[in-house]
């Protein structure tokens, strides 16, 4: 609510107010460098808010312990995860650590949740493969399964399709949408692919460098005139039929 976000005490975007409800997907779009990741990093507590407040399930983030936050919010950021000597199942199992105590010993109930999470993202077939050996698309599924293992209310994702080809992008977002429906999750994410944002989002938030420029449904946001203005298109246009940016010579 009324967040001011930035780095080293310098505000980049002010008056950021947004709400993510369970069962809904809220997507940040905007030009590269417009501040989408900065907003997400502030929401998850990786960056301190310069002013304003982040609430999680009715209470401020600052008032909650890290373990308490981990039981309510799961995070998938842009940086590649490279755990060594871990199978995909091991990575997913780490999502239960907020519930296991310091020793990290999984109970039978924890193991059951791990298997359910792997099944829900269609990853049982490669669950015992080394995480370092599977494809980028399979890795993202495993990270989604790890997020599910936390049994969160909110999942925050920063450009989760960045390293994926089109097949895996579509598969990943299909899995994510199913997760939202089946688990009543709230999802806040950033995307740079406008066609995917239009397809998956319930609400779209447009970030324009120093402000939130517009919030609306995909139907309200994805118009030729507005997208051209948001992305400063001087020699291009937005195709509403295909949700793509096209170069015009």
Regions found by a protein language model. Name each.
Residues 93, 108-126:
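Conserved ABC ATPase "signature" region
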Residues 155-158:
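Catalytic Walker B motif of ABC-type/P-loop ATPase nucleotide-binding domains
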Residues 29-31:
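The feature captures the beta-strand-to-loop junction immediately N-terminal to the Walker
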Residues 52-60, 69:
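Conserved ABC transporter NBD signature motif
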Residues 44:
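Helix-to-loop junction immediately C-terminal to a conserved catalytic motif
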Residues 229-249:
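ABC ATPase nucleotide-binding domains
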Residues 151:
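Conserved catalytic motifs of ABC-family nucleotide-binding domains
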């Amino acid at each position: 609510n009324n967040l001011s976000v930035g780095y080293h005490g310098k505000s980049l975007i002010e008056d950021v107010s947004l709400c993510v409800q369970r069962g809904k997907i809220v997507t940040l779009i905007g030009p590269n460098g417009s501040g989408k990741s900065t907003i997400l990093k502030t929401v998850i507590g990786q960056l301190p808010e310069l002013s304003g407040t982040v609430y999680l399930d009715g209470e401020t983030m600052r008032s909650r312990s890290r373990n308490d936050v981990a039981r309510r919010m799961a995070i998938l950021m842009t940086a590649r995860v490279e755990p060594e000597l871990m199978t995909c199942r091991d990575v997913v199992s780490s999502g239960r650590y907020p519930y296991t105590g310091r020793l990290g010993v999984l109970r039978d109930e924890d193991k059951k949740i791990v298997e359910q999470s792997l099944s829900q993202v269609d990853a049982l077939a490669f669950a015992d493969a080394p995480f370092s050996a599977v494809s980028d698309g399979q890795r993202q599924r495993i990270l989604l399964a790890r997020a599910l293992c936390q049994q969160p209310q909110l999942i925050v994702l920063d450009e989760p399709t960045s390293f994926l080809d089109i097949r895996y992008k579509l598969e990943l977002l299909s899995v994510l949408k199913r997760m939202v429906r089946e688990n009543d999750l709230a999802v806040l994410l950033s995307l740079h692919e406008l066609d995917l944002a239009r397809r998956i989002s319930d609400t779209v938030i447009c970030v324009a460098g120093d402000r939130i420029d517009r919030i609306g449904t995909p139907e309200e946001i994805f118009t030729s005139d507005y997208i051209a203005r948001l992305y400063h298109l001087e020699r291009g246009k937005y195709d509403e039929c295909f949700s793509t940016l096209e170069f015009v010579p």
